[in-house]
Swiss-Prot record:
Provenance organism: Saccharomyces cerevisiae (strain ATCC 204508 / S288c) (Baker's yeast)
Keywords: Hydrolase, Membrane, Mitochondrion, Mitochondrion inner membrane, Transferase, Transit peptide
Similarity annotation: Belongs to the peptidase S33 family. ABHD4/ABHD5 subfamily.
Subunit field text: Monomer.
A Pfam family of this chain: Abhydrolase_1
Bias type Polar residues, positions: 24-34
One MF annotation (Gene Ontology) recorded for this entry: carboxylic ester hydrolase activity
Induction (UniProt): Expressed in aerobic conditions and under genotoxic stress. Expression is increased during respiratory growth and regulated by the heme activator protein transcriptional activation complex.
The protein's name: Cardiolipin-specific deacylase 1, mitochondrial
Residue interval(s) of motif GXSXG lipase motif: 228-232
Gene3D superfamilies for the chain: alpha/beta hydrolase
Gene that encodes the chain: CLD1
Record domain AB hydrolase-1: where: 142-430
Role: Mitochondrial cardiolipin-specific phospholipase which deacylates de novo synthesized cardiolipin (CL). Part of the remodeling process of cardiolipin, which involves deacylation-reacylation of premature cardiolipin. Has a strong substrate preference for palmitic acid residues and generates monolysocardiolipin (MLCL) for TAZ1-dependent reacylation with unsaturated fatty acids. The hydrolytic selectivity of the enzyme toward C16-CL substrates contributes to the preservation of C18:1-containing CL species. Has high specificity towards peroxidized cardiolipids CL(OX).
Cellular compartment(s): Mitochondrion; Mitochondrion inner membrane
Length: 445
């Protein structure tokens, strides 16, 4: 049983603990001021990326001290602090920003909980506003951040810090998806394969739409941009389908989107041969929602130490510089531990949306961007931007095909950009370029 549980830590995640070879994990190349984002034409065919592959169990055991670097005493303290006040882990991270909780000269920010269903469940939001707006409230523009699988709004900390509010006309909203982060975590009402994916999607979409409505973002949808990452991109593309007659935003930016297309080997035997299906027990764990988060919750005092197997490699090389950045790294690790340790809920969407190994059960290309279904989004009047890291394991070729479909069949604006020196978490790996892209998109609204 322990062997099976430990092996669940190496399932091929969208964002989970990457004790993996070839994954977007530890040492992303440093940013270069001379590098530039790259537009990709729809005629280009790029290397088909491979999903992360697992390290053998024996190697994991041998490398335990280096794989989980959090000191034991710190891990125990994190557990005790979580029991005492789990909400403090979020505020501790956000307090590393220069405008929270005390406003700066130009920005103010606050945490907001918006009730989104009859059971009293809420969506957690971090809202950044200009201290003095230059336009009437109704004319403010809005940028909404939506995270991916297993993540939370705190992972956008480097974007919050640097993205300008452009003439004090913009508000930034970062939300935790229903059942994620510090949003309420009700018992997930679905079970795979008993329930179908469309019911699960509706559960998310209706609550997200209620949040848009209650936050008065539906009054002027032409002033809204949504930036969604990974599995959040998958959800928000399908959200457009559900509310196509009354869209909630003008532009959708899909950051390393999950579930766009099925695996494409470019018809080469070598690529087909390299890909091996996961073993049957691996698939069973995936379908039963046995994840690294299960380990974090069940191992109690060791949960933060287990979390460090992902967080130290993901964040440390980016944030660990001067003392202030080291303080932020510590807060970011503890934040990651807290959201991984909270009750499982929204994360169980994963087994409905994706097969073990990252293949979509129903791809966006099949559901939305098929020639036989060209009328699904034709009235959405939404602009699209597809962002991929140059070392991303999400397949840019699917984004290229879909972008071409949007432009040629639906006559909608769509573009694909590859961000240099970044992987799946490009919003963090190369946040300067990423923030610059978002700022340029904001200027177009």
């Amino acid at each position: 049983m322990f062997k099976s549980t430990l092996n669940s830590i190496i399932r091929r995640p969208l964002k989970g603990f990457q004790l993996l070879r070839g994954a977007d994990s530890s040492n992303t190349r440093p940013q270069s001021p001379r590098a530039s984002a790259r537009d990709v034409t729809e005629k280009q065919i790029l290397r088909t990326p491979s999903a992360p592959t697992a390290i053998p169990l024996r190697e994991i055991i041998y490398r335990v001290p280096s794989l989980f670097p959090r000191p034991l005493e710190d891990s125990v303290k994190d557990f005790r602090d979580f029991i005492k006040n789990e909400d403090a882990f979020q505020t501790e991270l956000l307090k590393t920003l220069p405008f929270y909780p005390t406003p700066s000269e130009s920005k103010t920010a606050r945490l907001i909980r918006t009730v989104v269903d009859d059971e009293g469940n809420y969506i957690n939001e971090f809202c950044i506003r200009p201290r003095k707006t230059s336009v009437p409230e109704a004319d403010l523009k809005h940028l909404v951040f939506i995270h991916g699988y297993g993540a939370g709004l705190g992972f956008f900390i480097k974007n919050f810090e640097d993205i300008p509010l452009l003439d004090n006309e913009w508000c930034i909203h970062a939300i935790d998806l229903p059942g994620y982060g510090f949003s309420s975590r009700p018992k997930f009402p679905f079970e795979y394969p008993r329930d179908n994916i469309h019911s699960v999607q509706d559960w998310f979409h209706e609550r997200i739409h209620t949040w848009f409505s209650k936050r008065n973002l539906l009054n002027r949808p032409e002033k809204n941009i949504v930036m969604a990452h990974s599995l959040g991109s998958y959800l928000m593309a399908l959200y457009l389908q559900k509310y196509k007659e009354s869209p909630s935003f003008k532009k959708l930016i899909l950051c390393s989107p999950a579930g766009v297309s099925y695996r494409d080997f470019n018809n080469t035997a070598s690529e087909v041969e390299k890909w091996k299906p996961p073993p049957w027990w691996y698939v069973k764990l995936w379908d039963r929602n046995i994840s690294p988060f299960t380990l974090v919750r069940n191992f109690r005092q060791l949960g933060s130490k287990i979390t460090s197997g992902w967080s130290y490699r993901r964040f440390k090389h980016i944030l660990n510089g001067d003392p202030e950045q080291s303080k932020r790294f510590e807060a970011l690790h503890r934040y990651a531990y807290a959201i991984f340790n909270k009750r499982g809920s929204g994360e169980y969407l994963l087994s409905f949306a994706l097969k073990c190994g990252g293949e979509p059960r129903l791809s966006l290309e099949q559901q939305l961007f098929d020639g036989k279904k060209s009328d699904i989004l034709k009235n959405s009047n939404c602009d699209w931007l597809w962002l991929y890291g140059d070392d991303d394991w999400m397949d840019v070729n699917g984004g290229l095909r879909v972008s071409r479909f949007l432009k040629e069949k639906l006559k909608q604006k769509s573009n694909v950009i590859i961000v240099p020196h970044s992987g799946h978490h490009l919003y963090l790996d190369n946040y300067k370029f990423f923030n610059n892209i978002l700022t340029k998109e904001m200027q177009k609204i």
